[in-house]
């Protein structure tokens, strides 16, 4: 199989409580897979610094399980951790996952929309199980990242045209 040519590589982090579906969202988007017997991956809580995890990230998904109110109530802490350790220009989307369990909903859409609007976040609800809005959520995030990168490069190019010497970083961020 021939290698694909890549123009940009963006580091995107997925944050949220354990078992909200972060790994399943990633698997659904990258491989179009979903595992019914998936085990919750243990990542972290808020107790220790995650600065290395955020280094170089240009996008983030804050994921909660729309059937577990507590996972939504922890989103402000995840957002604070992100804002402390990540680049100030990071693009963030709030994801309410598991819409396939609508009859078990404990987080009203209005609550999540209000929070996202107040914090300046994008917002979508998804289901990794049936693939609802998964591609749309990643594409929304990646499109906004791409737009920011292009604006930043345009500004740098404009500045460098008026300077005699300019050093520009390449327009991509290496994945880690």
Swiss-Prot record:
InterPro entries: P-loop_NTPase, Rab_GTPases_membrane_traffic, Small_GTP-bd, Small_GTPase. One of its GO terms (molecular function) is GTPase activity. This is Putative Ras-related protein RABA4e. It comes from the Eukaryota. Belongs to the small GTPase superfamily. Rab family. PROSITE patterns: RAB. GO terms for cellular component: endosome; Golgi apparatus. Pfam families: Ras.
């Amino acid at each position: 199989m021939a290698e694909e040519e890549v123009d940009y590589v963006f580091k995107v982090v997925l944050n949220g409580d354990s078992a909200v579906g972060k790994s399943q969202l990633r698997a659904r988007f990258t491989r179009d897979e979903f595992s019914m017997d998936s085990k919750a991956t243990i990542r972290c809580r808020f107790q220790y610094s995650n600065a290395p995890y955020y280094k170089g990230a240009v996008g983030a998904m804050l994921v909660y399980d729309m059937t577990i109110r507590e996972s939504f109530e922890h989103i402000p802490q995840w957002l604070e951790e992100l804002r402390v350790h990540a680049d100030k220009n990071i693009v963030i989307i709030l994801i309410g996952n598991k819409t396939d369990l609508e009859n078990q909903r404990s987080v009203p859409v209005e609550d999540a929309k209000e929070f996202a609007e107040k914090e300046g976040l994008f917002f979508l609800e998804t289901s990794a199980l049936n693939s609802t809005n998964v591609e749309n959520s990643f594409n929304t995030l990646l499109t906004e990242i791409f737009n920011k990168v292009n604006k930043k490069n345009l500004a740098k190019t404009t500045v460098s045209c008026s300077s005699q010497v300019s050093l520009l970083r390449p327009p991509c961020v290496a994945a880690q």
